[in-house]
């Protein structure tokens, strides 16, 4: 379908090169193999030649073109076959992570220029330009699915960039002819703008119109993409005095090292907690090999700061697992850990509070709980110490402080035990026999009443009123009815006073 033919002419004075120019020049450039399944800007259904697709000034840091717009539906992107603008950065930059969109496969390519002694220019001419057949993604036979009309396989999807420098002599011009994307920058300014999918187109640039200063050196950057089947040619004619300021360790002029170093494979240290990256492009690979110069930057924990946890990277998963920060042992303060609060930190509670017989939240100097004293219990129960009470604490069943009378009752029911509230001294009082309750009950003989001895023994006695203390009467009591009688004594019937 497409013919790729790029004709770039860099004219140098014949007098300079006629005697000193070598027969061939080799220039190593960067190539990025693309696969439509990974970047659908390749093998799009639509597209034609378009200018103004990219910015007119080259990014001085990345040194790759940038789209004017990242909107997919604008006319220029549609006409240029850019259906997914977000993947355009990977036309000319490495993206070797298969888990991300836009994956490509960086390679290096040697362009061999032949010196034309008649015209005094160097020429690279390839009318069947498929330099990475069976390379990159196409190492896998399953990726070799794009054929021309003759059912011939080629790798039709790749981009190439050439970053170099030249010293301006004041008379150089160049011409080129090409199809698909071809962009050329001189001094970071776009001088050739042929983007999109198109048949070969030619143009010319007069360097004398670019405002360059003779003797100064300027960047020369060429970007070329093949994005569609079925043909590819390239022809470069150059006699500009270009040179390479440095080569990366892959041998590519001003390369990025990606053509021979993949951070995911070359630099893989099998540690998920490091970010593996290739050496910087200008690294000099001395003793050893490229992996010896790789960088393995520890991953940074992005979890919010938590005073209860340290986050430690898991070398198997690459995740930052929370590791609890041990709380201080405060057992010497009678404190035990109950957990950690992400705002205030470790939380403690007194081990003394679980025992009702300990003073709450109080710890001795030797790290033991302080038990409640009798005075403590007196104050707790009565507000003050009652000297007639004995205070103690019972931890069984969570009872806590208890009290009992200091002066215990006597076993003799006729003794009353009492306590002096002022000094707490115990003393006893004898209870009268008729008041004391020694268990006599009501006597069967109704002429008697209950009576307790001082020892508390029941000894009922006759009612006192039976004896009227009159010697001239005979006192009697009916034991069944309790009726008391006082009959005059016989000897007292004839006189007023009884005689013996």
Curated annotation (Swiss-Prot):
Cellular component annotations (GO), alphabetically ordered? extracellular region
The alphabetical list of record keywords is: Glycoprotein, Secreted, Signal
The PA14 domain extends over 114-256
Which N-terminal residues, if any, form the signal peptide? 1-18
Look up the domain of life of the source: Eukaryota
Glycosylated residue positions: 59, 314, 341, 366, 420, 469
Respond yes or no to whether keyword Hydrolase is given for this record. Answer: no
* Record's subcellular location: Secreted
Entry's family note: Belongs to the prespore-cell-inducing factor family.
Q: Which NCBIfam families match?
A: Fibro_Slime (TIGR02148)
User: Mind telling me what this protein is named?
Assistant: Protein psiE
Q: Which organism is it from?
A: Dictyostelium discoideum (Social amoeba)
């Amino acid at each position: 379908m497409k013919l790729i033919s790029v004709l770039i002419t860099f004219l140098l004075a014949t007098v300079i090169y006629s005697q000193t120019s070598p027969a061939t020049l080799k220039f190593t450039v960067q190539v990025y193999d693309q696969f439509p399944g990974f970047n659908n800007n390749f093998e799009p259904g639509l597209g034609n030649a378009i200018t103004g697709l990219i910015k007119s000034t080259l990014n001085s840091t990345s040194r790759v073109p940038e789209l004017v717009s990242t909107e997919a539906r604008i006319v220029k992107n549609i006409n240029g076959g850019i259906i997914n603008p977000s993947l355009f950065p990977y036309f000319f930059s490495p993206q070797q992570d298969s888990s991300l969109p836009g994956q490509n496969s960086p390679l290096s390519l040697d362009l061999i220029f032949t010196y034309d002694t008649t015209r005094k220019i160097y020429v690279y001419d390839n009318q069947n330009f498929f330099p990475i057949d069976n390379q990159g993604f196409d190492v896998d036979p399953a990726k070799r699915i794009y054929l021309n009309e003759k059912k011939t396989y080629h790798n039709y999807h790749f981009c190439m960039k050439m970053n170099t420098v030249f010293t301006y002599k004041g008379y150089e011009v160049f011409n080129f002819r090409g199809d698909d994307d071809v962009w050329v920058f001189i001094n970071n300014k776009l001088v050739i703008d042929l983007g999109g999918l198109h048949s070969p187109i030619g143009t010319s640039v007069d360097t004398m119109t670019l405002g360059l200063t003779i003797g100064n050196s300027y960047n020369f950057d060429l970007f070329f993409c093949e994005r569609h089947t079925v043909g590819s040619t390239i022809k470069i004619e150059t006699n500009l005095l270009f040179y390479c300021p440095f080569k990366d360790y892959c041998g590519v002029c001003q390369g990025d090292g990606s053509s021979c170093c993949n951070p995911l494979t070359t630099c893989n240290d099998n540690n998920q907690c490091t970010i593996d990256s290739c050496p910087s492009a200008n690294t000099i690979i001395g003793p050893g090999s490229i992996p010896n110069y790789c960088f393995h930057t520890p991953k940074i924990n992005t979890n919010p700061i938590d005073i209860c946890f340290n986050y430690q990277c898991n070398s198997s998963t690459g995740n930052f697992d929370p590791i609890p920060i041990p709380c201080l042992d405060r057992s010497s303060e009678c404190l035990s850990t109950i957990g950690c609060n992400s705002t205030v930190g470790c939380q403690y509670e007194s081990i003394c509070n679980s025992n009702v017989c300990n003073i709450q939240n109080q710890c001795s100097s030797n790290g033991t709980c302080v038990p409640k004293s009798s005075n403590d219990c007196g104050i707790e129960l009565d507000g003050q110490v009652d000297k007639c009470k004995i205070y103690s604490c019972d931890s069984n069943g969570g009872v806590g402080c208890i009290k009992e009378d200091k002066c215990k009752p006597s076993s003799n029911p006729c003794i009353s035990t009492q306590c002096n509230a002022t000094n707490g001294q115990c003393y006893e009082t004898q209870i009268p026999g008729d008041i004391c309750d020694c268990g006599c009950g009501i006597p069967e003989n109704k002429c008697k009443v209950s009576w307790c001895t001082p020892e508390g023994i029941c000894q009922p006695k006759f009612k006192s009123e039976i004896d009227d203390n009159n010697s001239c009467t005979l006192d009697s009591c009916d034991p069944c009815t309790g009726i008391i009688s006082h009959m005059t004594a016989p000897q007292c019937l004839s006189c007023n006073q009884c005689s013996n």
